[in-house]
């Protein structure tokens, strides 16, 4: 087997106003997990998109199985045994699991797609690697964790020797994340190499064989779990000492700001997802909602934010009954929402940073007057957000 499965050699990649990768070199060996660690904006996703053929490097080389290659697109990478599970899944929601997995590489029989053969192969792969899934389920009906399994099976179906995973646990429950890490370790026992992109320190120390840390597009450290610690990794990521354990004083909650009484909410199929739910949230406290995905969490969030109306029950915000309130009414009361799928439900990708920054308030002063948007005010607001929260963008108009 090749000594180096995948490597970047002195890769540099620029975008307008941003040096995303600056002379970056990494190497992945067979049967090992290489963790690519860094803050948001460190250049991790750009680097793996170069390795997968989605971007062409401005300088430097990509090496696959000891051969320097010129990738013209993902097809080139896939044909050379590189698979990738993107942070935002590349699936066709109305199609079945098996159809998504074999799409573009369908088995045929007498000139027709042989779905029976495809289904058998998918079942065999899913059982072998502990990725059990219904091959005939519609992807749009699957929770996010199951959709990720579809993406992994897509790569395995194409006989990947390398699996690149971009922030794979960001959408998973802790139990699902633990299961995934076990699956990845099992995959490496077959000789497969894995590039694991994350900013979660505990996962890196638990699963990685080798660790590369990126900061501001540059490699600032290479190590192994036995040679470092959470504190050491955090310091490499941000360039300064980091306090990982914060002493918190006891909560001193104030008035009730959200009250839910006997709430009943149906899911997309009309089945009861929440049944007689009761709770209160007071000012100054954090309420955690735990549970395996698909047990009503999404329906609860959508009911609170006005995206889904309860069939029974009452919801009060600051003492005002808003059970059937619209998203605009609820937002006006000070309720903010960061959705599970930020790309699909949180932003408008074709809009600029400035335009996205006022999506839920464009109709209010000072951003508009008598229905006319005030572009200068919007840009100024967006720049304030970028400065305050360290948003990594060349400017607010992209």
What are these regions (language model features)?
Residues 2-398:
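Glycine-rich phosphate-binding loops of nucleotide-dependent enzymes
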């Amino acid at each position: 087997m090749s000594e180096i499965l995948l490597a970047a050699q002195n890769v540099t990649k620029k975008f307008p106003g941003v040096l995303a990768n600056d002379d970056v070199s990494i190497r992945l060996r067979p049967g090992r997990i290489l963790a690519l660690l860094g803050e948001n904006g460190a250049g991790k996703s750009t680097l793996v998109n170069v390795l997968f053929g989605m971007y062409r490097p401005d300088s430097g080389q990509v090496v696959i199985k000891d051969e320097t290659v010129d990738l013209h697109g993902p097809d080139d990478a896939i044909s050379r045994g590189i698979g990738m599970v993107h942070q935002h899944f590349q699936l066709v929601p109305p199609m079945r699991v098996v159809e998504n997995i074999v799409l573009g590489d369908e088995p045929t029989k007498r000139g027709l797609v042989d779905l029976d053969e495809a289904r058998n192969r998918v079942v065999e792969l899913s059982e072998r690697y502990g990725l059990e899934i219904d091959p005939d389920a519609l992807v749009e009906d699957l929770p996010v964790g199951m959709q990720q399994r579809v993406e992994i099976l897509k790569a395995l179906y194409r006989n990947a020797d390398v699996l690149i995973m971009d922030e794979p646990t960001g959408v998973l429950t802790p139990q699902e994340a633990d299961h995934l890490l076990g699956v990845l370790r099992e995959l490496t026992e077959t000789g497969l190499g894995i590039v694991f992109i994350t900013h979660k320190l505990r996962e890196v120390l638990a699963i990685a064989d080798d660790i590369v840390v990126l900061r501001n597009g540059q490699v600032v450290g290479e190590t192994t779990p036995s040679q470092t610690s959470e504190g050491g990794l955090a310091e490499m990521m941000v360039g300064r000492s980091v306090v990982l354990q914060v002493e918190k004083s006891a909560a001193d909650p104030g008035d009730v700001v959200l009250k839910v009484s006997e709430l009943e909410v149906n899911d997309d199929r009309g089945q009861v997802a929440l049944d007689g739910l009761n709770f209160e949230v007071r000012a100054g406290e954090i309420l955690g909602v735990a549970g395996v995905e698909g047990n009503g969490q999404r329906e609860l969030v959508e009911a609170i934010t006005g995206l889904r109306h309860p069939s029974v029950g009452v919801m009060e915000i600051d003492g005002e009954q808003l059970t059937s309130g619209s998203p605009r009414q609820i937002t006006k009361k000070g309720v903010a929402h960061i959705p599970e799928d930020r790309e699909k439900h949180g932003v408008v990708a074709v809009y600029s940073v400035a335009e996205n920054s006022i999506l839920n308030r464009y109709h209010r002063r000072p951003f508009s007057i008598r229905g006319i948007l005030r572009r200068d005010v919007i840009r100024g607001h967006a720049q304030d957000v970028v400065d305050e929260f360290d948003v990594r963008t060349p400017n607010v108009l992209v």
